[in-house]
């Protein structure tokens, strides 16, 4: 699974997933399914915000790469993928600026058009079951929930899907591609089945001492509005590279 993740996802996403697992004391060489799940979730969050801007009239607009209007304000602030300290700093800054209610748990995105935090879910199970789990955990009507599955299903708070159909279809296509690529390598069943995952985890624990620790580079993200907090984590060239890789999943 680890080899698949490194081949299928952009190196910047892999790097962020490595950092996240290290922050929580998890070993990606043992918990490979979690490694794959984190990378998938990160990519969906990036794709959710991709190309979406707000124009001078405060309306949402979709801008393709290379368009001179790309200097418009980003519609979504990406919170997922930051270290916890920086993530809460961003959340606090958003709340102070917009008057939004501070969430109990770290959300994944903030939507400047709808003025709400968004929790993104990617599930291998039934979307309605995962949605209810998220809702019961968050216990806040202020945070919008949007769940995607690998089968093309989705569920959102009050059936408000936030994005246009084409943007959501791009996310669903990517998830379906990941599922197909996993299946072609015989990885999908273990990714879906908790029992098989536990068996793989137990097997990995026995060989834990043989696993070399993975060096992790710290990589941070922030929007132009928060440049006073720290430098931009990614310039336009790196952003373009990341976007161009979204639908690529090379085979072995």
From Swiss-Prot:
Q: Which Pfam families match?
A: Flu_PA
Protein's GO biological process: viral RNA genome replication; viral translational frameshifting
Q: Does the keyword Protein transport apply?
A: no
The GO terms describing molecular function are:
RNA binding
Record keywords, A-Z: Decay of host mRNAs by virus, Eukaryotic host gene expression shutoff by virus, Host cytoplasm, Host gene expression shutoff by virus, Host mRNA suppression by virus, Host nucleus, Host-virus interaction
- Keyword Zinc-finger included in the entry's annotation: no
Q: Which domain of life is it from?
A: Viruses
This protein's major location comes to host cell
Q: Where in the cell is it found?
A: Host cytoplasm; Host nucleus
Site described as Important for efficient shutoff activity, located at 28, 65, 202-203, 206
The annotated site for Important for efficient shutoff activity and nuclear localization falls at 195, 198-199
Identify the catalytic residues: 80, 108
**Protein family according to the UniProt entry:** Belongs to the influenza viruses PA-X family.
User: What is known about what this protein does?
Assistant: Plays a major role in the shutoff of the host protein expression by cleaving mRNAs probably via an endonuclease activity. This host shutoff allows the virus to escape from the host antiviral response. Hijacks host RNA splicing machinery to selectively target host RNAs containing introns for destruction. This may explain the preferential degradation of RNAs that have undergone co- or post-transcriptional processing.
Record's comment describing the protein's domains: The probable endonuclease active site in the N-terminus and the basic amino acid cluster in the C-terminus are important for the shutoff activity. The C-terminus acts as a nuclear localization signal. The C-terminus is recruited to host protein complexes involved in nuclear Pol II RNA processing.
Report the protein name in the record.
Answer: Protein PA-X
- Tell me which species this is from: Influenza A virus (strain A/Henry/1936 H1N1)
Which gene specifies this protein's sequence?
PA
